[in-house]
UniProtKB/Swiss-Prot annotation:
Biotechnology: Lentinulin A displays strong and selective activity against the plant-pathogenic nematode Meloidogyne incognita but shows no further phytotoxic, antibacterial, or antifungal activities.
One protein family per Pfam: Peptidase_S9
Function: Prolyl oligopeptidase; part of the gene cluster that mediates the biosynthesis of lentinulin A, a highly methylated cyclic dodecapeptide with nematodicidal activity. Excises and catalyzes the macrocyclization of the methylated core peptide of ledMA to yield lentinulin A. LedP works in a two-step fashion with an initial cleavage at the N-terminus, followed by a second cleavage at the C-terminus of the core peptide.
Name of the protein in its database record: Prolyl oligopeptidase ledP
GO CC field: cytosol
Signal peptide: none
Species assigned in the record: Lentinula edodes
Pathway assigned to this chain's UniProt record: Mycotoxin biosynthesis
Binding partners and assembly: Monomer.
Transmembrane segments: none
Length: 744
């Protein structure tokens, strides 16, 4: 065998004596070797990890930069991403309508606003419309400071907002007056106009203003946990109340629980601000402990009197509204697909009462009280969103709206307003905003604004919905997007994306990059709704978790087999992609069925399934994967854990490209580090490369600048093209009609 271009791989020390003993229900004590455990030490704390990272970065960069199509892809992506896009508008308490906006290649979306009375003016303006209110692009020189969330005060005078840097889950909360917007001429790296309030030590933005607008509640950790660059799990989450104008050190502790350091405590307020719902989460399951209080009669400074409404790990509660002593919830209490319920806090002994019963065939994903007495419910039904309007007083259905649209929706509205904005998008629909009047008898809204993508004729594309049988015969739904004239004869390259976990549904989502991939490579983009998601309700999720996790891999592999059998693909032209939990999927499938795939892309993947609970948020994922330290769970986890089941012998692995970040504080990069080291050791002279692209300036996924995403996508697509021998149609006019897979 000739020596491949990537031989030899960068050296890394391998400790053959490193091992951990686990307890197995089937086999008793089991000693598991872990020769790359040294790579668990974070980048900043280990010279060995640092040397490994720098060597892998250089190695991968050299290979990727030598791909001829890489620069062409980068330029093509830049040109295609340069279009105006915006989010669903939201009317706020200051009399303005706010929306996020990007003129094309800005690093982050900016926040703009227009007076409610002047909303329609943005439809006739050639630019973004309205005025700039806040621009995260002005907060940093490299574009990696991102807005993680915001909340307007009830009085409309103050705006609390969270800022994260370099994709970290850690963020800082600031406050500014709504009368003090950003100026377009502002110097980058500065944030003038904000108030002196600075709230640190928070992971994620969970902020609720008190009804008097004098301060807000928030969740935080002790100062020593504000690292953001290590693997240590955050501990001792607490709830505080901050008063405007005071230092954080003077904030009032609302709740702490030192006996349970890994529980996550958060506080929600009812829309009126009168009732507070305090919840504890111990894992990623949809179960919580819940307490409630009437803070309108409580003294925050001297302690809130809490009433326990649920003391078992059985359900989750989301407060959606209140009327006098009646509180409205969305909950999965005795309803795995969720329902809407009420609680009279003056007669709490009567318990929770059902207002809108559970739909056994659809998952309730959001509930809002709008237009005084309308209950707007969004369901996930058969891998698509549905919007239903009910009467708040009786719970009875009024009508389904936008039933002619297939895809996903996002909504905004207020209880004191008859208007609701609805944003619809899909695989070939970049985004259309409708204004819907809830006090009118109609099931359709009026067009408000639509995203346009110049240079890409969206009518040239089509999306099919098909079902195929999994290994156990279960029917699995799948979306297939392609150009209408792409032949279904097995010659087109196929790119399959999967996730399969945490009840996260894979819905029709617009991506100009994906459509470009389909156009330039005459390819098909495929999304199977495998078990572990929630496309068909909570039962679908449960069929792909814990001891049933293998169903997820079987569903995904079965998708590829069906595509080949039905002439959508052939065995030489299938690439797959997955990130985070989807990284378990891609690496497990590459281990179990390497012959099915030509190229594998894994982004920020969870891969060492015996060690995941020890780092970052991993302990919370045991509800999804199981606990490796539980003998019964160990047996089914160890059986598929990608890091521990790398094939050997004469197996030919697909080409593999791993994306990770040295400071990812959601999924530690150690998963990718260890797995890539093991793959390169096991297959030093394989015909296909195993590369790892490591970023030193980003986190998990959120907050990446546009430039970062463009560069990553150019690396990804050009790597797939080289690995599968694809021809860019933009460079070869005949390739669009005569594309064929070149086996190299």
């Amino acid at each position: 065998m000739s020596v491949p271009q990537w031989d030899p791989y960068p050296p890394v020390s391998r400790d053959e004596t490193s091992a951990i003993t686990y307890q197995s229900k089937l086999c008793g004590s089991v000693t598991v070797r872990d020769p790359y455990s040294a790579l668990e030490v974070p980048f900043d704390d280990s010279e060995e990890t640092k040397a490994f990272v720098h060597a892998q970065r250089k190695f991968a960069r050299t290979y990727l930069d030598e791909i001829p199509d890489r620069e062409t892809w980068l330029q093509t992506l830049k040109e295609s991403w340069n279009y105006r896009r915006f989010t669903v508008p939201k009317r706020e308490s200051d009399g303005y309508t706010y929306f996020e906006y990007n003129d094309g290649l800005q690093s982050q979306m900016s926040l703009r606003r227009v007076k409610v009375s002047e909303e329609d003016t943005i439809l006739t303006e050639s630019g973004p419309g309205g005025e700039l209110f806040f621009d995260p692009n002005l907060l940093s020189l490299d574009g990696n400071a991102a807005l993680t969330g915001s909340m307007m005060s009830p009085c409309g005078k103050y705006w609390a907002y969270g800022v994260s840097e370099h994709g970290s889950d850690w963020m800082t909360t600031y406050v500014r007056k709504t009368s003090s917007p950003h100026m377009p001429s502002q110097e980058k790296g500065k944030d003038p106009g904000r108030m002196d309030d600075v709230i640190r030590y928070s992971r994620f933005f969970i902020v609720y203003w008190s009804s008097d607008s004098k301060g807000f509640f928030y969740s935080r950790y002790p100062p020593e946990d504000d690292e953001g660059k290590g693997n240590t799990p955050a501990q001792n989450c607490m709830v505080y109340y901050h008063r405007l104008g005071e230092k954080q050190e003077k904030d009032t502790l609302v709740y702490e629980d030192p006996e349970h350091p890994f529980w996550l405590w958060a506080l929600q307020l009812s829309p009126s601000g009168r009732y507070a719902l305090l919840t504890a989460s111990r894992d990623a399951s949809h179960t919580q402990l819940a307490k409630i209080a009437d803070i309108g009669t409580s003294d925050i400074q001297n302690g809130i009197q809490w009433l326990t409404i649920h003391d078992q790990w059985q359900a989750r509660f989301v407060i959606i509204g209140d009327d006098d002593s009646t509180i409205y919830f969305m909950t999965n209490l005795e309803a795995k697909n969720y329902l809407v319920a009420t609680l009279d806090i003056r007669h709490s002994e009567a318990g929770v009462k059902t207002l809108v019963a559970e739909n056994p065939d659809a998952l309730l994903i959001s509930a809002s009280i709008l237009s005084t007495d309308k209950l707007v419910l969004v369901y996930l039904h058969n891998a698509r969103h549905e919007i239903h309007v009910h009467d708040l007083n009786t719970g009875k259905p009024i009508r389904q709206i936008f039933d002619n649209l297939i895809g996903q929706f996002s909504l905004s509205g207020r209880r004191d307003d008859n208007d609701m904005f609805v944003f619809h998008s899909g695989f070939t629909s970049p985004g259309t905003i409708y204004r819907f009047r809830l006090n009118e008898d109609s099931n359709k809204g009026t067009l408000f604004r639509a995203v346009q993508v110049p240079g890409l004729n969206l009518s040239d594309f089509t999306t099919e919905s098909v079902f195929y049988p999994s290994k156990d015969g279960t029917p699995i739904h799948m979306f297939i997007t392609r150009l209408k004239d792409t032949p279904v004869d097995g010659t087109a390259p196929v790119y399959i994306y999967g996730y399969g976990g945490f009840a996260l549904a894979m819905l029709p989502t617009f991506s100009v990059s994906t459509l470009l991939f389909c156009k330039i490579y005459r390819a098909m983009y495929v999304v199977p709704n495998i078990r572990g998601g929630s496309e068909f309700g909570e039962s679908w999720h449960r069929e792909g978790m814990l001891d049933k996790k293998q169903n997820v891999f079987d569903d995904f592999n079965a998708a590829t087999k069906w595509l080949v059998a039905n002439k959508y693909a052939n065995k030489y032209n299938v690439a797959i992609r997955g990130g985070s939990n989807g990284g378990v999927l891609t690496t497990a499938c590459a281990n179990q069925a390497p012959e099915l795939y030509r190229c594998v892309i894994t982004i920020g993947g969870i891969i060492d399934m015996l060690r995941f609970p020890k780092f970052t948020f991993g302990a919370l994922w045991r509800s999804e994967y199981g606990d490796p330290e539980d003998p019964e769970d160990f047996d089914f986890i160890y059986k598929y854990s990608p890091y521990h089941n790398i094939p050997s012998g004469d197996v030919v692995l697909p080409a593999m490209l791993f994306f990770t970040a040295a400071y990812d504080d959601r999924v530690s990069p150690l998963h990718s580090f260890k797995h890539v080291a093991a793959l390169q050791y096991n297959f030093p002279n394989g015909p296909n490369p195993v590369l790892m692209r490591i970023d030193l300036n980003t986190g998990h996924f959120a907050g990446k600048s546009t430039q970062k995403m463009l560069e990553e996508t150019a690396d990804e697509y050009s790597f797939i093209g080289k690995s599968m021998g694809l021809v860019m149609c933009a460079q070869n006019e005949h390739a669009s009609k005569q594309w064929s897979c070149v086996v190299t």
